[in-house]
């Protein structure tokens, strides 16, 4: 329903602007002045009609860039007054470019069409946006991309998938030894139920674990399809979780974790994380706190339409007092119309 509303709104907006442009074109064609249509009538006093030279183009572009920078800084201050001031800063540069040569009603129509296309682009970005680039989780040399990497890809890369056999949980050391989990044979005997769901269980209680060379790395969740069950091999990875035990075991066996090239097994100081993730970082630990529960990073990769049209991704990294990772989660929300 959400998709239908947004797409319908954009279609109505596009039709309105198309009619507006067509109406203005017909007005310029039918309205006459001194025997000529406004479409062909000059609208300024300039008589030069040749194309702009390279030097002139550079001059006007420089003016536009300078005016645009000042206008952008003014807009960032917020407020209606600053919005009007930004337009007043930018308008003279635009008018200088417009009046550099003889212009007719045709030029005004071209400007209107350009503005309409720009306005539609702004509306598209505000309502739908563009798909975010999925973060890449790297374990040693193997890369995992949520909603793209399949269970079969993991197994081909040397990972083992374990399926939970009961309801109880086990200590980390016994997860693969006490029968709580059984190694998946890759025989298409396990299917992922239709629909999207993330797992909220702690690692020892998760439905699926994944391991490398007998070392449990964490829990993992899969998504097959919205309307049918899918065999595990063909299902996509949508969630990966590490806990303190699995992180320590990975370090002991020289297994590295990276998220978009950031080494997660190193000290994760705020400047380092900010430099690596920039706009994707939405929460950082407060400074000078002794409460270890507040030491965590929140990351997101999303568009303006949430997950209506594009997949979106989230990560939570918990730390100890030394800013070393103690818990990690990377999850995706698959694009769907709820």
Each language-model region and where it sits:
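Internal/C-terminal transmembrane anchor helices
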Residues: 104-130
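Membrane-embedded alpha-helical segments of integral membrane proteins
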Residues: 4-6, 12-16, 53-102
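Alpha-helical transmembrane signal-anchor/signal-peptide segments
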Residues: 132-145
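N-terminal signal-anchor/start-transfer transmembrane helix
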Residues: 13-30
């Amino acid at each position: 329903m959400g998709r239908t509303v947004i797409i319908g709104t954009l279609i109505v907006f596009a039709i309105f602007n198309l009619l507006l442009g067509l109406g203005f074109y017909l007005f310029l064609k039918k309205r006459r002045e001194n025997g000529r249509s406004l479409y062909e009538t000059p609208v300024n006093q300039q008589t030069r009609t040749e194309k702009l030279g390279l030097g002139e183009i550079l001059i006007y572009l420089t003016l536009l860039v300078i005016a645009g920078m000042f206008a952008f800084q003014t807009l960032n201050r917020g407020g209606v007054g600053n919005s009007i001031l930004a337009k007043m800063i930018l308008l003279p540069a635009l008018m200088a470019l417009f009046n550099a040569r003889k212009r007719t009603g045709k030029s005004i129509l071209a400007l209107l069409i350009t503005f309409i296309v720009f306005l539609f682009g702004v509306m598209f970005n505000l309502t739908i946006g563009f798909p975010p680039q999925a973060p890449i989780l790297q374990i040693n040399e193997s890369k995992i991309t949520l909603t793209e990497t399949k269970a079969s890809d993991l197994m081909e890369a040397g990972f083992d998938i374990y399926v939970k056999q009961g309801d109880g949980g086990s200590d980390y050391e016994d997860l693969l030894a006490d029968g709580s989990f059984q190694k998946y044979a890759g025989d298409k005997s396990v299917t992922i139920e239709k629909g999207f769901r993330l797992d909220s269980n702690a690692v020892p209680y998760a439905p699926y674990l994944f391991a490398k060379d007998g070392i449990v790395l964490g829990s993992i969740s899969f998504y097959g399809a919205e309307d049918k069950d899918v065999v595990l091999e063909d299902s996509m990875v949508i969630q990966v979780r590490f806990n303190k035990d699995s992180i320590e075991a990975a370090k002991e066996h020289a297994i590295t974790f990276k998220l978009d090239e950031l080494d997660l097994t190193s000290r994760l100081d705020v400047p380092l994380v900010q430099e690596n993730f920039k706009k994707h970082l939405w929460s950082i630990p407060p400074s000078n706190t002794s409460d270890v529960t507040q030491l965590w990073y929140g990351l997101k990769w999303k568009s303006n339409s949430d997950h209506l049209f594009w997949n979106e991704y989230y990560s939570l990294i918990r730390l100890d007092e030394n800013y070393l990772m103690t818990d990690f989660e990377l999850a995706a929300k698959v694009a769907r119309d709820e």
